[in-house]
């Protein structure tokens, strides 16, 4: 079956960045022997020229490509995770040395349903501009595999932290939860429903900063639009997913936020069972208990979100203005930015950060001519990948992605408060099926 993927949200014939010798020719790169200065003297290759040349002429690099240890401009390291239809590996971008997460999918296993999910995943990530949402840098295709190159969050999953260290303190929970809620608000304002919010899909980039990732089950849904597919992890599933033929997406995401908050402040799940059938019964009954160490304001917020009737659940704004969340700063969305570098070659009036990005690209050897030749390739281009990585780096440096700061209690004091309560549950695997 021929894979078809997103271009502006629709399904079209695939056109992914597949590196071959044409890339260096189209980008204006020549072999080293033909690189001469104005007086006919050999000159040093730019980093971009050197890399593109090595990918076709350097024996070691060619061998890495052949063995699957390199794709495009990325050297592939060890596995750092796995998704519903994929594995995730650490990658190093050869030009910028940026660490990235590379989601690898086997093209032979991409049926029509999986193709639609992948298309939505790419589309969703490219529509969102928020400091607490994982970014997509590039999409690379080889003969047998597809690679989604994304921002790397080196601090691990929220699930892993709580599973090994125990529940978070309430001040820490507020800080982390505020970032997740702000990210979800941004999604919903852009008509995107995540449908798989859980601790396994929240990633630390520092001790106090997290990002929401894995948009593999996301979809676009207008306000009030009814959906009819079950997506996500059963312990986080809202009751209407088990009960009704249709559901409204934002309410499902909000329910998952309630489960997530409960997990953060207690170190365990509100609804637990040995089988999915028993779990379904527990969720439909809506019976759960909140440990006495949880403050009353936090308890009320959890209760307000985990309402059986979707329309009676707290909305995002209500959550953000809740008593328990008072005094917690919410990150704000970034100003929309260009996902393609073409504007750098089309206008002479650039913002400060755009000039810095352009200057860095030129230092690497990526000129306006390369950028003009790159038009129309979207994320499926090594040049676009370099541009997005550098843009993100510049934005981080300018504190557009600020890291929250708060005073946390002494670790020993936290351990005493937690006692021996450490969540030893297994990772929650997301499911996909149609509700009949």
Curated annotation (Swiss-Prot):
Gene3D superfamilies: Transferase(Phosphotransferase) domain 1. Residues 74-325 form the Protein kinase domain. Changing residue 333 to S: In a lung neuroendocrine carcinoma sample; somatic mutation. PANTHER family: MAP/MICROTUBULE AFFINITY-REGULATING KINASE (PTHR24346), NIM1 SERINE_THREONINE PROTEIN KINASE (PTHR24346:SF49). It comes from Homo sapiens (Human). Changing residue 229 to E: Constitutively active. Its EC number is 2.7.11.1. Keywords: ATP-binding, Kinase, Magnesium, Metal-binding, Nucleotide-binding, Phosphoprotein, Serine/threonine-protein kinase, Transferase. InterPro entries: Kinase-like_dom_sf, NIM1K_STKc, Prot_kinase_dom, Protein_kinase_ATP_BS, Ser/Thr_kinase_AS. One of its GO terms (biological process) is intracellular signal transduction. This is Serine/threonine-protein kinase NIM1. Its cofactor is Mg(2+). ATP binds at residues 80-88, 103. The modification Phosphothreonine is found at residue 229. SUPFAM superfamilies: Protein kinase-like (PK-like) (SSF56112). It catalyses: L-seryl-[protein] + ATP = O-phospho-L-seryl-[protein] + ADP + H(+); L-threonyl-[protein] + ATP = O-phospho-L-threonyl-[protein] + ADP + H(+). Belongs to the protein kinase superfamily. CAMK Ser/Thr protein kinase family. One of its GO terms (molecular function) is ATP binding. The active site is at residue 196. Activated by phosphorylation at Thr-229, probably by autophosphorylation. It holds the Pfam family Pkinase. Residues 23-55 are annotated as: Disordered.
């Amino acid at each position: 079956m021929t894979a078809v993927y997103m271009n502006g949200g629709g399904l079209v014939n695939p056109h992914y960045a597949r590196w071959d010798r044409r890339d260096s020719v189209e980008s204006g790169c020549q072999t080293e022997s033909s690189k001469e200065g104005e007086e006919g003297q050999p000159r040093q290759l730019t980093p971009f020229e050197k890399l593109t040349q090595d990918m076709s002429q350097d024996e070691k690099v060619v061998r890495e490509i052949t063995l699957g240890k390199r794709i495009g401009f990325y050297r592939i390291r060890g596995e750092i995770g796995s998704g519903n239809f994929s594995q995730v590996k650490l990658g190093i971008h050869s030009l910028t040395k940026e660490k990235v997460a590379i989601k690898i999918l086997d093209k032979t296993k991409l049926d029509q349903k999986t193709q639609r999910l992948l298309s939505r995943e790419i589309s969703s990530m490219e529509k969102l501009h928020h400091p607490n949402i994982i970014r997509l840098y590039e999409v690379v295709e080889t003969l047998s595999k597809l690679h989604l190159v994304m921002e790397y969050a080196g601090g691990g999953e929220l699930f892993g932290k709580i599973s090994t260290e125990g529940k978070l303190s309430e001040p820490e929970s507020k800080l982390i939860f505020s970032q997740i809620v702000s990210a979800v608000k941004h999604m919903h304002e852009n008509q995107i429903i995540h449908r798989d919010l859980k601790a396994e899909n929240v990633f630390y980039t520092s001790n106090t900063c997290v990002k929401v990732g894995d948009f593999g089950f996301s979809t676009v849904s207008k306000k009030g639009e009814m959906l009819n597919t079950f997506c996500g992890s059963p312990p986080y599933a809202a009751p209407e997913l088990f009960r009704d033929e249709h559901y409204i997406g934002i309410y499902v995401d909000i329910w998952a936020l309630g489960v997530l908050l409960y997990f953060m402040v207690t170190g365990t799940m509100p609804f637990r069972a040995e089988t999915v059938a028993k779990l379904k019964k527990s969720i439909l009954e809506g019976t759960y208990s909140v440990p006495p160490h949880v403050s009353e304001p936090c308890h009320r917020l959890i209760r307000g979100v985990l309402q059986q009737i979707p329309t009676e659940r707290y909305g995002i704004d209500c959550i953000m203005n809740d008593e328990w969340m008072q005094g917690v700063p919410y990150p704000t969305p970034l100003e929309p930015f260009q996902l393609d570098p073409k504007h750098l070659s089309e206008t002479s009036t650039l913002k400060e950060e755009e000039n810095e990005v352009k200057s860095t690209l030129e230092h690497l050897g990526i000129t306006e001519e390369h950028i003009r030749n790159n038009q129309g390739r979207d994320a499926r281009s090594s040049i676009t990948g370099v541009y997005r990585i550098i843009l993100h780096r510049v934005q981080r440096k300018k504190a557009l992605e600020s890291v929250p700061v708060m005073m946390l209690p002494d670790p020993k004091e936290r351990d005493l408060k937690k006692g021996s309560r450490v969540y030893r549950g297994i990772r929650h695997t997301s499911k996909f099926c149609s509700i009949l």
